[in-house]
Design a protein with these regions (language model features):
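Catalytic cores of soluble metabolic enzymes centered on carboxylation/carboxyl-transfer
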Residues: 6, 24, 45-236
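Conserved metal-phosphate-binding beta-hairpin within the catalytic cores
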Residues: 15-41
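A long amphipathic alpha-helix within ATP-dependent nucleotide-binding catalytic cores
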Residues: 1-25, 153
Length: 236
C-alpha cells in the first residue's frame, strides 16, 4: 500500500526519474506523507542492498530516454539493511564538527558490508565540506543479523587523526530499544545522555597504532646499530 501511494504521488505530478517519497509510520500501522525529493537520497544504498537493484543505473537509463529495466512486481525484497553515516564530529560535544589529518584509514569489508567513501589515508578533513566522510551499509537475513553485522563493521572502522561518530553509532545499535524497534523520532533526544556517555580512554592505543603506521619511524626504530651489526650474533 505504501509503495502504491508513493507511485501515485509521482504520477500526480507527472514526475519521471529517480526520486524518494518519505512517510512517517505510526504505532497503529498508519503512515503519513512527509515530502517528496526529486533525487536519490543518501540512504539509497539500503534499497539497493535489499532489492539488488542498481538505482543509479536506472536513473541514467531514464535520463537517456529509456524505460525501467524491470517491472515493480519483479523487484525482490530480501532481508534487512541498515546505513550508518560516518561523520567527522564529536558526539560528546554537541556534535561539534571535527577537522584534522587522516593518519590511518582502515575501512571494514566482508559479506553484507558496503562502504561508500570519499576519504583516503593521508587526506585532510577541513571546514570546507560537509562532515559526512562515508556511508557504511550492511545487509542481513533479518534485523538482528543486520544489527550484529553493523556493530561489528562500525567497531572495525578505523579512522585515526580525526574524531568521528563511530562510538555514538555503536551505542545506538547496542541500545535495547533500537534492537527491538521500540523507538520514535524522539529517541536520540530522550537517550542523549546514555548514547553520548564517554567510553574507555584508548588514546594511548591510537597513538601507538598511528606510530606503527609510519613506515619511516618503524624502520628507524628497528634499525640495528652499526656496532652491533659488526659484532654479529652472540650469547652470554
Amino acid at each position: 500500500e505504501i509503495c502504491e501511494t508513493a507511485a501515485g504521488i509521482a504520477r500526480a505530478v507527472k514526475y519521471r526519474g529517480a526520486g524518494t517519497v518519505e512517510f512517517i509510520y505510526a504505532q497503529d500501522g498508519a503512515f503519513y506523507f512527509l515530502e517528496m525529493n526529486t533525487r536519490l537520497q543518501v540512504e539509497h544504498p539500503v534499497t539497493e542492498m535489499v532489492t539488488g537493484f542498481d538505482l543509479v543505473a536506472e536513473q541514467l537509463r531514464i535520463a537517456a530516454g529509456e524505460g525501467l529495466s524491470t517491472a515493480q512486481a519483479d523487484i525482490p525484497q530480501n532481508g534487512h539493511s541498515i546505513e550508518l553515516r560516518i561523520c567527522a564530529e564529536d558526539a560528546t560535544a554537541d556534535f561539534r564538527p571535527a577537522i584534522g589529518d587522516i593518519l590511518l584509514l582502515d575501512e571494514p569489508s566482508g559479506p553484507g558490508v558496503r562502504v561508500d567513501s570519499g576519504i583516503l589515508s593521508g587526506g585532510k578533513v577541513t571546514t570546507g565540506f560537509d562532515p559526512m566522510l562515508s556511508k557504511l551499509i550492511v545487509h542481513g537475513a533479518d534485523r538482528p543479523e543486520a544489527i550484529a553485522r553493523a556493530r561489528q563493521a562500525v567497531r572495525n572502522y578505523v579512522i585515526l587523526g580525526v574524531t568521528t561518530n563511530t562510538g555514538y553509532l555503536d551505542a545506538i545499535l547496542a541500545h535495547p530499544d533500537f534492537a527491538a524497534g521500540n523507538f520514535s523520532t524522539s529517541f536520540l533526544g530522550e537517550q542523549a545522555q546514555t548514547l553520548t556517555a564517554p567510553g574507555e580512554d584508548v588514546s594511548h592505543l591510537l597513538i601507538a597504532a598511528a606510530a606503527l603506521s609510519d613506515e619511516r619511524l618503524v624502520a628507524e626504530v628497528m634499525q640495528i646499530p652499526e656496532m652491533h651489526r659488526k659484532m654479529g650474533e652472540w650469547r652470554n
